[in-house]
Amino acid sequence: MKKRVLITGANGAVGKEAVKIISEKTDQYEIICLDHNHKRTQNRIGQYKDFVSFEYADITNINSLEPIVKNLDYVIHLAAIIPPLADEKPDLARKVNYEGTKNLIQLIEKNSPNAFLLYASSIAVYGDRLHTPDITVGDELSHSRGDAYAKTKIDTEKALRESNIKWSIFRLTGIMDPELNKPNPLMFHMPLETSFEICTTRDCGRAFVNALEHEKEIIGNTYNLAGGESCRAKFKDFLAAAFMVSGLGKVDFPEGAFGTANFHCGYYADGDDLESLIHFRKDSKEVYFEMMSKAIPEWQKFAAKLFAPLIKWGMLQTSEPWQAKKSNDKEGMKQFFNITI
């Protein structure tokens, strides 16, 4: 008999990769993709409609969720509000990430008590590790100043551990989607000297799908999920490579454009533990940049090269650290630079 798998956040960056991979295993699984946005879901993963079923519900509304969370064997829980939206709307982030997951837990306890849930947590739960970049699962959890997203992840992990369901937690490093190559203002929050370890979306999606076959080995445990040694670089070097691939040239922003404190990321010193169990790694950072280059049309690279100064000026205007420095904003200077004025 096929196992029933629910994937929440199925049209997200990791979700779409998980759907792509698991859709090749319909001999093993009956796959239910859950999201709240019908149009976006059809645009991103509608091509798999012959292999999966689609359900639409608001995870914060337990009544709309209940008919879907029945007779399940597995739940891959990826639905979340992530930065920068989580920073802009912290109340929404808490409602979706924490309260929504508690709804899911309650319904699993009631209607699918034997289901095994895989939860996507985040490296953000370790807080600022700029000067102590080697991270292990047993390290203290401490979200960075102003990081509402990390707080929701810490609290949700606690809720899972206190529940009566079967679970495993994967703390995701920086997950990179080569198809999402537009500038993200969040990059300015990260100190350039940050030790940065990535994982591609497809390796991450593969991890969640592979993990379904290893319930007994990983149940009740927490793991750090990242791409490994071949996916490591200082953020300044990673960004320099990304700019070259996209046609923007040098990362030549003025001093103060990037924060120097209160972010997150580092190297997962125990990241090989999960890889040794579920064998999900295939991509290196070089492979990521190759995929990124292929995803950007040549005309776009040419235009980026031609208008690079103007584009980078526009990017600078989105830098919160830069704006805080220019305006001598007390809260901003404390958050991004650890400077009290």
Predicted feature residues:
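NAD(P)H-binding glycine-rich loop region in Rossmannoid oxidoreductase-like domains
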Residues: 48, 52-99, 128
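Mid/C-terminal beta-alpha module of Rossmann-like enzyme folds, strongest
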Residues: 214-277, 283-291, 299, 303-307, ...
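Glycine-rich NAD(P)-binding loop of the Rossmann-fold in SDR/ketoreductase-type enzymes
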Residues: 60, 92-103, 147, 151-152, ...
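Alpha-helical substrate-binding/gating segment
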Residues: 177-179, 186, 195-224, 228-230
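Active-site Tyr-X1-5-Lys
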Residues: 131, 143-168
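N-terminal Rossmann NAD(P)H-binding glycine-rich loop of SDR-like oxidoreductase domains
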Residues: 5-25
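Flexible, glycine-rich beta-alpha linker
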Residues: 125-126, 147-148, 168-189, 194
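Conserved Rossmann-fold NAD(P)-dependent oxidoreductase catalytic core, especially the SDR/UDP-sugar
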Residues: 81, 102-148
